[in-house]
Amino acid sequence: MVAANHLGIKTIIHEQNSIPGVSNKLLSHFVNKICVSFKESEAYFPKKKTIYTGNPRSEEILSMEKGKREDFGFNHKSKFIILVMGSLGSLTMTKKMKELIPSFKDKDYQVLVVTGKNYYDDYKDVKTPTNVKIVPFYDAKYMKDADLIITRSGASTIAEVTALLLPSIMIPSPYVTHNHQYKNAKALEDKKACKILEEKDFCKENLLSLIDDCFKKEVYNEMRKNLKEFSCPNSAETIYKEIMRLVRNEE
């Protein structure tokens, strides 16, 4: 980017997290345009260069065909929850989730537990209630039929839940650089658009209590309403237009 700047080549960067990383902060002094996923990020960059565009993942998931909970043997009589800790899964969370799963017995909701491909075999000894299905991975299209998701809070996940106005319980990974996931989730929680349960506080009592709270009508509707503030369904198109403005020297 710096070399391109010296050569007179137009440059644009996109910051996916709510609190920018060191690289983009440094590059912001050299590039022509800065696109951000969170309104809160604008304060960290030169005002004249910065535009709030959201994350292109929003547009991608909205264009997907809707997955059906029936594919997992679930119905529409009860709420449908997805519990996922990333595509690979998490060793720490696997231990906690194995203890949690039997507690879903007799609950009036259905739970799809996505283990991640690295830890699926670890669940073979778990006594699984009839309202729980355990799978190694899933397609994000099933988020479109979910009532609640319990998940990490990486930039792509934030883009997905905000695009779908999907209430969530975020469990930020404490192992990422600069604690980005917690900061992403906190941006939503501060606007009452999600719930946060830190990994160190994760236990079946805390999670079950949060699930019950999320399904209270007034809480659920408030989260969906507040998620609209973060939703950018035309993100990719907006970024494309900014790129073309640079190409045409219209900035």
Indicate where each model-derived feature is located.
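Short alpha-helical segment that forms part of, or immediately flanks, the ligand-binding pocket
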Residues: 2, 140, 158-166, 186
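Active-site-proximal region of nucleotide-activated glycan assembly enzymes
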Residues: 5-66
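Structural loop-to-beta junction motif characteristic of Rossmann-like glycosyltransferase folds
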Residues: 9-10, 147-148, 165-173, 193
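Short loop/helix-cap segments at secondary-structure boundaries that form the rim of catalytic
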Residues: 25-28, 40-49, 121-129, 143-144, ...
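Donor-nucleotide binding loops and adjacent catalytic segments primarily
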Residues: 66-67, 74-149, 182-185, 190, ...
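Acidic donor-binding loop of glycosyltransferase active sites
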Residues: 144-159, 166-167
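A short, well-ordered alpha-helix in the C-terminal region of glycosyltransferases
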Residues: 219-233
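C-terminal alpha-helical cap of glycosyltransferases
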Residues: 232-251
